[in-house]
């Protein structure tokens, strides 16, 4: 089977696509995978690193408002569609799976022009423009959030790397802490802000360094590649404050931590619940509040806290986060609550759907594919 994946720009688009690719290869090692991407997205690094072919197509941002940029969209979009179609023809694609982002729209339209089956995966509660368009071109639409309102949508979860979905935090916790230069006997806070970091989170954490030292809380702080500054004295009284620009093995960062403080993108929320790591969510106030909607079910279930970006401060951390990190029983309860919301099998579930659709065996809503272990998924 020859599969083309269209999803680039951010980790939230790229990582689920690659997790699906891995699952398809586990089912059939002969599956051919081509990823469509842009010149500037994270896919430039992640796709080759994971062993897949990347084909570039022009990025075509769709303006949300009436601006002069709208005049250039038809010509640029036509060029991107033509480029995507050439790649589909070159690999003789059997199916295209889109995950949103700038490359998804040309991918959907190119596949439609070639009568190639289309699958849409929308990770967020509020679907983006590209996937709303894609959902009009196919009945095969799957969502990462149970309450996403999109045409033909069926909840399936967000595909995750097996390093995340198979992670046993307790089993590898001490090894993970040793890797990052952390002690095995102290409560541990993991701070990160997504692939590029988050200035507000970084600053509030740095401002609170003295409070973490005094409370005996060690910190693993992933600041982002452009934000390598941090407390000058990073270990005090034997309490580490480890600052790193980026972590490729994020599963080890999760294993090292008792609690995370982070943004609440759809992929982040899916990973944290899959591994049962409670979090303080600091939603990025963008778009229609997608990040807040991602975190709300976890917070309501008792698996996390949420604070507005504008309200995060040293005082808030001192009042809410530090007492939590020193309350072992509460951390255990929050971890269990988060884990109850996690879905670890979405990669295999979506892979089976893609295979069935490519073969013309799409199940109806009344006769869904059985994703239980009895159906052959024995990971």
Swiss-Prot record:
Family matches, as Pfam families: Glyco_tran_28_C, Glyco_transf_28
Reaction equations catalysed: di-trans,octa-cis-undecaprenyl diphospho-N-acetyl-alpha-D-muramoyl-L-alanyl-D-glutamyl-meso-2,6-diaminopimeloyl-D-alanyl-D-alanine + UDP-N-acetyl-alpha-D-glucosamine = di-trans,octa-cis-undecaprenyl diphospho-[N-acetyl-alpha-D-glucosaminyl-(1->4)]-N-acetyl-alpha-D-muramoyl-L-alanyl-D-glutamyl-meso-2,6-diaminopimeloyl-D-alanyl-D-alanine + UDP + H(+)
Record carries keyword Phosphoprotein: no
GO molecular function: UDP-N-acetyl-D-glucosamine:N-acetylmuramoyl-L-alanyl-D-glutamyl-meso-2,6-diaminopimelyl-D-alanyl-D-alanine-diphosphoundecaprenol 4-beta-N-acetylglucosaminlytransferase activity; undecaprenyldiphospho-muramoylpentapeptide beta-N-acetylglucosaminyltransferase activity
Binding site for UDP-N-acetyl-alpha-D-glucosamine: 10-12, 124, 161, 195, 291
SUPFAM superfamilies recorded: UDP-Glycosyltransferase/glycogen phosphorylase
Membrane topology reported for the UniProt record: Peripheral membrane protein
Superkingdom to which the source organism belongs: Bacteria
Pathway note: Cell wall biogenesis; peptidoglycan biosynthesis
Enzyme class: transferase
Gene3D superfamilies in the record: Glycogen Phosphorylase B
Main location: membrane
Cellular component annotations (GO), alphabetically ordered: plasma membrane
Biological processes annotated in GO: carbohydrate metabolic process; cell division; cell wall organization; lipid glycosylation; peptidoglycan biosynthetic process; regulation of cell shape
InterPro entries reported for this sequence: GlcNAc_MurG, Glyco_trans_28_C, GlycoTrans_28_N
Cell location: Cell membrane
Keywords of the record: Cell cycle, Cell division, Cell membrane, Cell shape, Cell wall biogenesis/degradation, Glycosyltransferase, Membrane, Peptidoglycan synthesis, Transferase
Enzyme Commission number(s): 2.4.1.227
Primary role: Cell wall formation. Catalyzes the transfer of a GlcNAc subunit on undecaprenyl-pyrophosphoryl-MurNAc-pentapeptide (lipid intermediate I) to form undecaprenyl-pyrophosphoryl-MurNAc-(pentapeptide)GlcNAc (lipid intermediate II).
Family: Belongs to the glycosyltransferase 28 family. MurG subfamily.
Name of the protein this chain belongs to: UDP-N-acetylglucosamine--N-acetylmuramyl-(pentapeptide) pyrophosphoryl-undecaprenol N-acetylglucosamine transferase
Lineage summary: Bacteria, Bacillati, Actinomycetota, Actinomycetes, Streptosporangiales
